[in-house]
Amino acid sequence: MHDNTYLPDHFLHHIAAIMPAHLSMDEFVASCRRPLRRSIRVNTLKISVSDFVMQMQPLGWQFDAVPWCETGFWLTRADESVPLGNTAEHLSGLFYIQEASSMLPVTALFASDQVKRDGMLLDAAAAPGSKTTQIAALMNNQGMLVANEYSSSRLKVLSANIQRCGVTNVGMTHFDAKVFGQWLPETFDAILLDAPCSGEGTVRKDEDALRNWSIESIDEIAAVQQGLLESAFHALKPGGVLVYSTCTLSQQENQAVCQSLLEKFGDALTLDSLADLFPNAEQACTPEGYLHVWPQIFDSEGFFVARLRKHHSVPNTMFKPGKLGKFPFSPLPAKEAEPMLREIEANFGVVPPGQLFGRNDEIWLFPHLFGQVQGKLRFDRIGIKLAETFKKGYRLTHEWALAYGDKATQGVVELDSANAREFMMGRDVWPEQEAGTGEMIVRYQGHTLGMGKWVGSRVKNALPRELVRDNNLFGA
């Protein structure tokens, strides 16, 4: 019980006025004071749900399915001596620690049969990356996903989570999301706008979330949200799907923002009902078809989700192409790219799909659809850094290993638990298998830990220093 959760009276009076008649304020307050259930989402870019559950159940992990996400589970662990975020499985990207309610927007987006999984998608407010990586998994790394984040302080964690989860089809940008309607009109097949909000639904994980709450601040945020939603609408192709979501409860930031867009653009868009999104979704569905998740309904965070469809174009007074600097990458000539890809296939049995671009001494793998937005948008990061070049060749990167190491059929060293512990502590290891030559992918239980290099019978550790852990990551 979080007895110190700050729930000011003026907030509770505000909530009481909008609480549906069939729900109880007493249950709402009690829910807000209860700790959140721990929840995770299995990363199917790395492992199937069934294989993950089978692998972790012997370690005392118990799974309770999240009804609106096939890959989501509430989790209890018999042994919590290793923090969940420091487990080897988490560092290898097999799962993402994600609040259950926050899995809803992406589920709503892909429940639409109109979403092209190999198309051009936008996550307009992406950090820390839970929904970006969820979208990429449902796209199976196909197409291209633009992941935008306005806050510069959150870009690093977004990038780290994208790399950890083996996501290869993302281009990261750093803009106020209002630019997408101006610079890229009718470009995206589907858009998620998980908008910045007052965070009223997050008190179960942040007892001070409402410390600065006021009606005035809600009205200010709602004005920002309306601008972001209108821009997203203009950036969406006719026939496309737009999901708007928040982790807040006030109607000013939710229904009213969507209603403003619906009224402004008339028959150019419609609202989908989400009453059938998952079993018992109707318990949280409004008469209009929005999902308004109160924390006491599903024992989760508070959340709001709306799904809109764009039917035809409208005049776009926002359009104003952005000013871009010189693009720092050049396509890698075929005489360089083809031998490199052949060598990677010969050494590891896997061919990374995409386009190779070079910058200084780096070789990057860009998504196939990158050409659709090249020259229209400035990116902080595109695809994955495949390798670093030297006078006598190249060295594959850790993120290449995380993205493709599980698919490799050769050039692999499988470690036992003792050697895996040593490897994750940044130490060289002496595996039992016969020594080879050159670089190899280092795995444990079939999943990639990183890269290494044979030096005699020793595997020289190439784990990035920031990922080295000085404790046991494998539990009892």
From Swiss-Prot:
One of its GO terms (cellular component) is cytoplasm. Specifically methylates the cytosine at position 1407 (m5C1407) of 16S rRNA. It comes from Aeromonas salmonicida (strain A449). HAMAP family: 16SrRNA_methyltr_F (MF_01579). It comes from the Bacteria. InterPro entries: Methyltr_RsmF_N, MeTrfase_RsmB-F_NOP2_cat, MeTrfase_RsmB-F_NOP2_dom, Nol1_Nop2_Fmu_2, Nop2p, RCMT, rRNA_ssu_MeTfrase_F, RsmB/NOL1/NOP2-like_CS. The active site is at C247. It catalyses: cytidine(1407) in 16S rRNA + S-adenosyl-L-methionine = 5-methylcytidine(1407) in 16S rRNA + S-adenosyl-L-homocysteine + H(+). One of its GO terms (molecular function) is rRNA (cytosine-C5-)-methyltransferase activity. This is Ribosomal RNA small subunit methyltransferase F. Keywords: Cytoplasm, Methyltransferase, RNA-binding, rRNA processing, S-adenosyl-L-methionine, Transferase. Belongs to the class I-like SAM-binding methyltransferase superfamily. RsmB/NOP family. Transmembrane segments: none annotated. S-adenosyl-L-methionine binds at A125, A126, A127, P128, G129, S130, K131, E149, D176, D194. One of its GO terms (biological process) is rRNA base methylation. The lineage of its organism: Bacteria, Pseudomonadati, Pseudomonadota, Gammaproteobacteria, Aeromonadales. Its EC number is 2.1.1.178. It is found in: Cytoplasm. NCBIfam families: nop2p, PRK11933.1.
